[in-house]
């Protein structure tokens, strides 16, 4: 940022891999924290090997690990244990997403660490939480999407589908990040550290609350409707001449405006099939046919222009490449360069925008790039 970031001077030790924990700690790094990432000796974070699409590097790793220092370490060895002890003695935050039971076997459980380091904040990220029948079960994003019910409400009537991004991991990473910030704020008041856990199932479960409420209290399962909204109509893609336009409504006022100003079908406002949103959802197929009949004479650009003039929300379906060239991002100067071992890459600024301050887009580290420097700093008497 312009000057020191809000977390400048904070030391985070991260024994992490994959997505959830690295997403949390990368956001801490964006705020100025010093993040020391411990990677497995000889292999590193296995996310380094997911693909080679970004100048020979994995897209997930480049996204999630900028601004960190990479230390290659065998944490099971005597030296590895000594290094971890030295790091944690000075750390403010310890984040780990090891396999179930691994932290305890390594002597890195939260209870033991807090007994030795009273101001340390310990964050443990897991698939299903520290107890219960699923505690020891391995968890990956798609599998947690299944267990949380997300696939049951996503896709077409015939085929359930996963979300196109690692939504369970991302959810857990966000809650781990905010959990760390909350614990830091609490430490300012109490002078003591604390520990907390975040599970992928709990994180995604929070996001699945509306479908749960709809199902359990409404007595019916949400429909899988592809790109359409399951409980609001009209809301989704509609075919125009030469392409689709996505339209979204939220209330009866907007419905009346759509009928009058966009469709030129004010008679639909009083049509008993479409009087309320539940009515429109019930008769969605009929309504879709009516809307698309009107839009068939207009190009997508003409439809969007008419929707904009009427104040009705709309969107065009974009690919990732088209998103990267989005005119709104360009107009707001949202792109920066981040260094990687393979060369500079474009990266989006973090979503939180503070006037006069800009997040530091730190470099993505090579495996073990900072090992010797960190060991010399934290174990100055060590002999190689």
Residue ranges with predicted function:
Residues 173-193, 206-217, 260-264, 269:
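Oxidoreductase and adenylate-handling cofactor-binding alpha/beta cores
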Residues 1-179, 183-189, 301, 338, ...:
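N-terminal helix-loop segment corresponding to the beta1-alpha1 unit
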Residues 35, 308-322, 381-384:
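Short, well-structured beta-strand/strand-turn elements
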Residues 233-310, 314:
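Aromatic-enriched alpha-helical interface/lid elements that frame and gate functional surfaces
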Residues 42, 128-129, 200-205, 242-244, ...:
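Glycine-rich beta-alpha junction loops
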Residues 61, 225-230, 235-236, 247, ...:
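Short Gly/Pro-enriched turn/cap motifs at secondary-structure boundaries
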Residues 130, 157-165, 188-204, 223-230, ...:
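Conserved Rossmann-fold dehydrogenase catalytic segment
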Residues 1-11, 223, 239-240, 321-384:
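Terminal low-complexity tails and localization/encapsulation signals of metabolic enzymes
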């Amino acid at each position: 940022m312009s000057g020191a970031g809000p977390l400048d001077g904070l030391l985070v030790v991260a024994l992490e891999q994959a997505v959830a924990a690295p997403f949390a700690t990368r956001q801490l790094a964006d705020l100025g924290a010093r993040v020391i990432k411990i990677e497995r000796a000889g292999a590193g974070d296995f996310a380094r090997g997911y693909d080679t699409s970004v100048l020979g590097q994995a897209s997930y790793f480049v996204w999630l690990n900028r601004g960190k220092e990479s230390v290659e370490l065998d944490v099971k060895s005597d030296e590895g244990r000594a290094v971890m002890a030295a790091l944690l003695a000075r750390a403010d935050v310890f984040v780990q997403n090891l396999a179930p039971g691994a932290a305890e076997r390594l002597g890195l459980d939260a209870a033991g660490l807090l007994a030795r380091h009273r101001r340390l904040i310990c964050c443990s990220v897991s698939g299903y939480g520290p107890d219960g029948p699923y505690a020891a079960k391995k968890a990956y994003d798609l599998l947690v999407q299944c267990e949380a019910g997300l696939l049951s409400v996503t896709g077409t009537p015939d085929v359930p589908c996963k979300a196109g991004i690692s939504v369970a991991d991302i959810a857990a990473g966000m809650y781990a990040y905010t959990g760390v910030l909350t614990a830091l704020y609490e430490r300012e008041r109490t002078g003591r550290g604390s520990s907390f856990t975040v599970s992928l199932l709990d994180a995604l479960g929070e996001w699945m609350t509306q479908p749960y409420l709809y199902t359990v209290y409404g007595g019916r399962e949400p429909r899988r409707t592809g790109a359409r909204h399951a409980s609001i109509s009209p809301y989704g893609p509609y075919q125009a001449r030469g392409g689709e336009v996505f339209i979204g409504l939220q209330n009866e006022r907007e419905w009346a405006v759509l009928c009058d100003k966009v469709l030129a079908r004010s008679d639909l406002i009083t049509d008993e099939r479409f009087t309320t949103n539940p009515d429109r959802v019930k008769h969605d197929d009929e309504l879709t046919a009516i809307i698309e009949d009107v839009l068939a004479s207009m190009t997508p650009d003409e439809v969007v222009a008419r929707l904009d003039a009427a104040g009705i929300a709309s969107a065009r379906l974009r690919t990732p490449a088209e998103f990267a060239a989005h005119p709104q991002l360009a107009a707001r100067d949202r792109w920066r360069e981040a260094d990687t071992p393979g060369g500079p890459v474009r990266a989006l600024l973090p979503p939180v925008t503070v006037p006069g301050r800009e997040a530091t887009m730190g470099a993505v580290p090579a495996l073990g790039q900072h090992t010797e420097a960190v060991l010399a700093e934290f174990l100055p008497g060590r002999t190689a």
